[in-house]
Amino acid sequence: LTYYRSLDELPPFDDYDITKGRTYKYFKGDVLYPFGYGLSYTTFKYSNLQVADGEEEINVSFQLKNAGKYAGDEVAQVYVKLPERDEVMPVKQLKGFERVTLKSGENKKVTLKLRKDLLRYWDEAKDKFVCPSGDYTIIVGASSADIRLQKVVSVLQKDNYPMSHSEK
């Protein structure tokens, strides 16, 4: 859930076009509480982002360290920015997350697998889902606004990924 600083930042209530900034995916301003925001009694450091392009998925791994004095939980989030296109595209989309519990000073390697078929989007002109090849930005952080790591990776996609179970 995203809390905007002002109602003036939202499109009219009867305008359901999300590309006009209705969600964190398209909103470009500063918000009061960004999507994924949380509080903690400790601090976490992210490092060593590794991204590997596989045939059916993209493997994202990074180190997460509890740099504070207390044990705590962190919900590490992975967002993806799609390659630049002519049509309106999301600023970023949440594609994975993991809740990690760490003791003070503890370090852990976090690995998330992002299925390539979930990177597709609906192309209005083609009237179908497409998975464009190109430069994807992999974004890792504590919320949609608290970005700690990012890396651009060239991804080879195909348009014929099987549909997920929920779409059959």
What are these regions, as identified by a protein language model?
Residues 1-73, 79-81, 133, 138-141, ...:
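Secreted, periplasmic, or luminal enzymes acting at the cell surface/secretory milieu
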Residues 57-59, 107-111, 148-150:
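Intrinsic-disorder/low-complexity, polar/charged segments enriched in Ser/Thr/Lys/Arg/Asp/Glu/Gln
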